[in-house]
């Protein structure tokens, strides 16, 4: 997702990498309006602890919309403790069918350490191939870089950081100011 319906607002880059029993979610800190960087230190990766179960979530798209979705996800996780996939599917169903939520423009990458999922407003809950998920304006660059690095002797955090740096070097809507959260399987 590279833009919202608000003219000129551009997204971010978020990547999730799962390797050797660890999942890392990393996101850049840039918020842009047209050709102007509004903020370079936004935090778009969060750790949630509903019911004492750790979940890491990263978002791309409208910040207000993403926070609304994160609150809903947290409520779903509290209702179904330790069941990330079920909570994600319930959120996606609500997002797809609720008239208010349908207007929200964001995407999420979420993990509990065992599952790595992408949740979209189209009602998709996707577990990515190759244990890598990437969203946002630089998502394809980060995904390609991470796939190339997976066979090397790097851990999940190193792969995520290197992939994000490559995306930041290519995508003008992505910077190198990263927020990184790791979670064990």
Curated annotation (Swiss-Prot):
An annotated Gene Ontology molecular function: metal ion binding
GO terms for biological process, alphabetical: proteolysis involved in protein catabolic process
Activity control summary: Allosterically activated by HslU binding.
Active site: 12
Major enzyme class: hydrolase
E.C. code: 3.4.25.2
Binding site for Na(+): 168, 171, 174
Compartments it resides in: Cytoplasm
Keywords: Allosteric enzyme, Cytoplasm, Hydrolase, Metal-binding, Protease, Sodium, Threonine protease
PROSITE patterns documented for this protein: PROTEASOME_BETA_2
InterPro entries for this protein: ATP-dep_Prtase_HsIV_su (IPR022281), Ntn_hydrolases_N (IPR029055), Proteasome_sua/b (IPR001353), Proteasome_suB-type (IPR023333)
Catalytic activity reported: ATP-dependent cleavage of peptide bonds with broad specificity
Keyword Signal: no
Pfam families, A to Z: Proteasome (PF00227)
Gene Ontology terms: cellular component: HslUV protease complex; proteasome core complex
Disulfide bonds: none
Family from the record: Belongs to the peptidase T1B family. HslV subfamily.
Role description: Protease subunit of a proteasome-like degradation complex believed to be a general protein degrading machinery.
HAMAP family assigned to the protein according to its UniProt record, in alphabetical order: HslV
Subunit structure: A double ring-shaped homohexamer of HslV is capped on each side by a ring-shaped HslU homohexamer. The assembly of the HslU/HslV complex is dependent on binding of ATP.
Name this protein carries in UniProt: ATP-dependent protease subunit HslV
